[in-house]
Amino acid sequence: STLMRSSAASDVYKRQEIRRFLLTLGSHRHVSALARLFNGSKKESLKHDDIMPVVMACLNMGKQKVGALIVIEHNVPLDEVVRTGELIDAAINQRLIENIFFKNSPLHDGAMVISKKRIKAAGCILPVSHDLNIPKELGLRHRAAMGISQQSDAHAIIVSEETGAISVAYRGQFYLRLNAEELESLLTKEN
C-alpha cells in the first residue's frame, strides 16, 4: 500500500516535471501542439456570448479603476495555477467577476482563471516575468500576466488600478489600452 502510494506520487511528480520541461521548449505553438497531444483534443474556444460578460466586467472595472487580472486557459492546462487559489467553478458572469475584484474582496489581489467556459478559481498566484524589457510604468499585474503568457497559450487580461486601462498579455506580447471591440476581437481569436 505504501509502495503504491509512493509510486503514484512519483508518477504525478514526473508528469508535472515533463509538463514544465515541455513548457520551456520552443515556441508557444509547439507547446500548444504538445499539450494537445498529452491532454486530448483542442479545447472549445470561447465565443461572443462567453466573452461579453468578461469584456463588460473589464470595462466597468476600468471606469471605476478597480484592478483585475483574468486568465483564460486554452490548450495548455493551468491546473497548477488553479490550485494556488480558491476554487469557484461557476458560470462566467459579469456581476460575479466584478464582485471578486471589488477592492475589499478577499480574492481581489490574485488572478481569476477561466477554463472550459467556467470561472474555475480566483485569488490565484501567477508566475512573474523577469523580462527587463517590460516598461517600468507597468506594475506587478502586468508582470504576472506576461509570466503566464510566456509559459502557456492563455490570454491574460489586466485592468490597471491606476489608469483603468485594459491590456492583454498573449503569447509573450502586450496589447495595451484596448477598447471593448479590440478586447473582444483578441479574446475570440483562434489559438
What are these regions (language model features)?
Residues 17, 21-191:
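Divalent-cation
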Residues 1-9, 13:
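Single conserved hydrophobic/aromatic residue that forms the stacking wall/gate
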